[in-house]
Every structure is written in C-alpha cells, then in structure tokens.
C-alpha cells in the first residue's frame, strides 16, 4: 500500500486535477506498469482486490511557503500486521519504552518481511503515535535524530534488536 506524507506550502495553488486524484493515478500507473504486487482490497470485509493498489493513504499538512514536499512509504501488509501500540503510564519512563520496542520486535520475530525497519512514535494520542512511527519509516536508515538523547536511544535499541538474533 502506498502511504504518502505531503507538505503543501500555504502559498501553493494547484490547477487541474485534484491532488488526491493525481496521487492515486500515479499509484495506479506505478503498480500496473511497474509490475508491483497488487494487494489492496477496496472493502476489507468483501476482500475484493482493487488490482491497482488504490486508494493511497494520504497525510497532508499545510506549512509555510510556496513548495510541495512529498514522501512516499510503500508498505506491505506483513509489516502492517507486525505493528504494535503500547499505552505506557508516565511512571514506565524510558525503561517502558525500551521494553515495548524490544517486545514488539521479539513478537514479530521472523514474521516481518526483511529487512526489518522499526519506526517508533512516542507521545500524544493513539493516532499521533501511529503517524509518528510511520513517518519515522521515511527517514534514511543511516540517519539518526538530531536530538542527542534520542540518537543515543536509537543506537542502543538497534544494538539490542540486533542481539535478538532474529535475522
């Protein structure tokens, strides 16, 4: 499934086709002409495949300026099935975060399709955490946070995850 994060400058004006329609047309062409796996169903209860992986998931944010920035995260449903949400109490602190991350990766085990890339969202509501985690997956894998203590946590968790010996 194609997940898009779109930042639109407040001074941008689109003409012609609606942005959502244009993105879905791009997804349609990419999946039908690019020989990519078609795995999206229009209605999850009926299970009828759309055969072109539309509609895409769009997250749109209005920002300052006159530019458009689009990031796309092609997601397989194996990775979606391995997603986890942990609601921690404030008293759980950073240890609770560490435990939750390792538990999620351990539980996913070999069921997640390689390579395993872990996105973590911390704070806010249920939906905000999921969105933050998904946005984290759009960062280059060799890029770390600019915040020193977050960078330290990322490096620590990568080391501990690799020590699990999952693959």
Task: Cite the ranges covered by each PLM segment.
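N-terminal glycine-rich anion-binding loops that anchor highly charged ligand groups
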Residues: 1
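Non-transmembrane, aqueous-exposed alpha-helical and coiled segments at domain scale
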Residues: 4-120, 125-167
């Amino acid at each position: 499934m194609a997940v898009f994060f779109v930042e639109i400058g407040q001074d941008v004006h689109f003409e012609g086709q609606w942005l959502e329609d244009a993105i879905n047309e791009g997804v349609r062409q990419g999946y039908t002409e690019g020989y990519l796996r078609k795995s999206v169903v229009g209605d999850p209860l009926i299970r009828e495949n759309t055969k072109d992986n539309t509609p895409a998931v769009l997250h749109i944010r209005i920002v300052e300026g006159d530019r458009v920035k689009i990031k796309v995260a092609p997601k397989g449903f194996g990775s979606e099935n391995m997603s986890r949400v942990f609601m921690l109490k404030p008293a759980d602190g950073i240890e609770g975060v560490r435990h939750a991350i390792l538990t999620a990766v351990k539980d996913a085990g070999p069921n997640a399709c390689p390579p395993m890339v872990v996105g973590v969202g911390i704070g806010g509501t249920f939906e905000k955490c999921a969105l933050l985690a998904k946005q984290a997956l759009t960062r280059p894998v060799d890029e770390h946070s600019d915040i020193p203590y977050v960078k330290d946590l990322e490096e620590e968790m990568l080391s501990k995850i690799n020590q699990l010996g999952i693959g």
